[in-house]
Amino acid sequence: MSTSHGYRASWWTNILHQVPHTNFQFEVVDNQFAPQEWPYQQALLFLASIAGLCLAISLILICVYLIRFCCCASQEDDDSKNHRVCCVTWSCVAAVIICCAGIGIGFYGNSETNDGVYQVTYSLMNTNHTLTSINLLVSDTVELLSSVVKSDLTQLEEIFSKRTEFLVMIRNTRRQVESVAQQLAEISFWKGTELNPNVLAEQVNFIEDYRWLAYILLLLLDLIICLFTLLGLAKRIKWLVIVMTVVSFFVLLLSWGSMGLEMATAVGLSDFCSNPDGYVMNQTQMITNINPDILQYYISCNQDVANPFRQRLTTSQRALSNIHSQLHGLEREAVPQFPTAEKNLLAVQGMLNTTEGNFHHLVALLNCRGLHKDYVDALKGLCYDGMEGILFLLLFSFLSALSFTAAVCSLPRAWKRFQNRDLDYDDMDEDDPFNPQESKRFVQWQSSI
């Protein structure tokens, strides 16, 4: 389980994490998230292939039903045919209604997934802003200290060259300034790493845009098929129902395929979300070679993990305090004797004030709470909203696949019974919900009221 403060794996994550992981040899595989390992990839592909098995079963059922329909249709009497037409029509309507309900679920799931991924990208950009601010603040402060050492402190050494006690104080100040610069330079832990959170956020956002668009198109396609199927049944347009039957068959393949992809994604994501800290720490350390203590500090952010920057920050703070004392002593004792040194001492004092302001800002940025909050927000977006959205998309694909399986079985029987619209409809079943005669009587009855 995750030890991150503020994040806890959800119950559906724990349930999916317990799904058996089996490779192609039907051997149990460890359910720890390891997408780079072939056995784990086999386990996810095996789960995705379950949808392929369901597709094969649905195709067999469709074939058996259509064969029976073709062979047994001629043996039915007229009353049985009319009754069956009514049942088939209602079956098609029920399948379309279920599909429409699935489409609504799909739109919600797609939106939830998009919200979760957006939260991840937003957190990555915040993380990049914090890390960039640390690097810029450190580099600016180190550059400022170096410039003071090269200019003002060097000039002060020349001015106090004949006074040993003042020269010793200036050289001590110089060593402490150089020590502060060195300590701060070592704090910039993310500088020069190959992992850029902003680039990663752009890549994730790019992939998510196409994923979101693909699902929107699939949902709209399903909705259009449902509407045109109802139109064809209501108006008894044979060619339209035939076209919708063919299109429904291809969408049936897409539905089972998307279900397999969503099933593998949901299980893989649950494996990650059940214990994200270990995977994130190992991968980040492998790519960036950052000290594991630093990564553990920001990932855990609790009292049990010491601040890895504490010693450097404490040393720098003491050095800045000593520099303050020495500068005050020089202003009090040296300036009356060396008036030309006042300008350089004021410049060093201004540098010291700026450095202390940057130092306090740097301490706030280095605190684990900011980066840890971004990390937890990313986990919540991915493992709460993202996981919930994928599960709703999985339900949509399942309902869509079942609905189109029923439609492909039922629509051929419906279009075969359609009569030419110019013929007499007296022999039609009065209980048929799309009987044109019944609709005509209803319109006449309304006009007479």
From Swiss-Prot:
UniProt catalytic activity: chloride(in) = chloride(out); L-glutamate(out) = L-glutamate(in)
Superkingdom assignment: Eukaryota
Keyword Repeat assigned: no
Sorted UniProt keywords: Cell membrane, Chloride, Chloride channel, Disulfide bond, Glycoprotein, Ion channel, Ion transport, Membrane, Transmembrane, Transmembrane helix, Transport
Glycosylation sites: 128, 282, 353
Species assigned in the record: Xenopus laevis (African clawed frog)
Gene Ontology molecular function: intracellularly calcium-gated chloride channel activity; volume-sensitive chloride channel activity
InterPro entries: Tweety
Gene name as annotated: ttyh1-a
Complex and partners: Homotetramer; disulfide-linked. Homodimer.
Chain ranges on the Extracellular side, renumbered to this chain: 1-43, 108-212, 260-388
Described purpose of this protein according to its UniProt entry: May act as a calcium-independent, swelling-dependent volume-regulated anion channel (VRAC-swell) which plays a pivotal role in the process of regulatory volume decrease (RVD) in the brain through the efflux of anions like chloride and organic osmolytes like glutamate.
Disulfide bonds: 273-383, 301-368
Record flagged with keyword Kinase: no
Essential for the formation of the channel-pore, annotated site positions: 163
Transmembrane segment boundaries: 44-64, 87-107, 213-233, 239-259, 389-409
Major site of localization recorded for this protein: membrane
Family the entry assigns: Belongs to the tweety family.
Protein name: Protein tweety homolog 1-A
Membrane topology listed for this record: Multi-pass membrane protein
One GO cellular component term noted in the UniProt record for this chain: chloride channel complex
Cytoplasmic side: 65-86, 234-238, 410-449
Subcellular locations according to the entry: Cell membrane
